[in-house]
Amino acid sequence: MAPHSSPGPASYRQVLGHGEFRAIFAADIVSMLGNVVAAVALTVLVFQRTHSPALAASVMALAFLPYLFGGALLGAAADRLPARRVLVGCDLISAALVGAMVIPGIPVAGLLGLLFVAGLVSPVYAGARSALLPEVLAPGPRYVLGRALLRMVVQSAQIVGYGLGGLLLAALSPRGALAADALSFAASAAVLRFGTAARQPRAGGAGSMARDSLAGLRAVFGHRQVRRILLFSWLVPACAVAPEALAAPYVTHIGLPARSAGFLLMGIPAGTVAADVIAARLLPTWLQRRAVLPAGLVVFAPLAAFATLPDFGVAIGLLVICGLGSAWGAGLDGLLVEAAPEHLRSRALAISSAGLMFTQGIGFALWGLAGQFAPLVLVIPGAAVAGTAVVIVLRPPGGPRPASRRSGLSRRSGLSWQTRRTAPPSAPRWPASRTRRWPGSGPAGPSRRRGPDPGRAR
């Protein structure tokens, strides 16, 4: 019996050599930079108009909340309509909604309403893109590396975009920055329209889209392995956002101005970018999957050190290490795609993206609320304890061992692999339990961790 060989890592040349993936990748770069810049601009615009910190903060909340409704009620669109039409249509709708925010004199309630409606489009786009990616890059190492590249776009956009947003706001008005975001959506639509191929819908549909979406949600959660993978991919980031939710209170607590929080917020995205490069590019598939548990623990180990109120430089370093633990995403990406039955795959990926954004928003709110009533030296380490428990309880199964790790039995039995491959049926074979494959994972969006987006967080 031939040994099971785990596929090696793919290369950036192989992934970026695919024209359709290049179009998806380029569209994400353009629109994500516009999104992050516009997030800053809309927050500033609302604060300038109202002088209310609560209403300004509601911009961030409204970037997450629609994912619950959009993912649950509109998720079937990714299956019932052609993928390219969904992607281009979502971009054009978002461009129109963000463009309407530029209208002079529009009331704050109108701005927040437009933001909420634009947010409903986001999970539909994310689901269609996530479902399209396995068709563009077949499930395997190339798919995992492609997902990692898209996550890197999101994290890099957060690092670069907030600084770029500050520069643009110095040169333009908040409305000018919002207009730039609307143009970025239009540019993304053009790239996707001419850079991706037309495909038939993955499934037909009769009756209400909302009813179909809810039925798909029940079917996905009825699959035990998929449900476990989804809960892991949602609850780990929801616990890990605690230091970001409390960044401003933390820096003021250690005696620094609140504006220093922006530098603290760069720590986790920087570590996440490095983790995606290392895990998706350098590790073979079997090791990516076996690294999910230890990498998940690495996310929360540095947060326990916040019980000592580390100084600013040390705190940034701890958050970079926390971001490095995000390497668990590479293994989970392949696991979800393999675990989900083919007829539920696109629905599972859409639900994964929507749930990720929604649970992160809930995490921000809950940890921020905890920081109102408990000292920071307890809240952030408390998030570490909760997150560690989630990792241990919901840990997904690891991948199969590579052939080289199994060669010991051949040596002990005196048979080489070549001999075993040509031996008669009576020759000893590996037990089935040693050669089984575990199913595997992989969400969408923009990333495990994505920043809020006034138009769409991808």
Question: What kind of feature is each model-predicted range?
Answer:
Residues 1-420, 429-430, 434-437, 445-448, ...:
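Alpha-helical transmembrane-bundle signature of multi-pass membrane transport and export proteins
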Residues 424-425:
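Hydrophobic alpha-helical membrane-insertion segments
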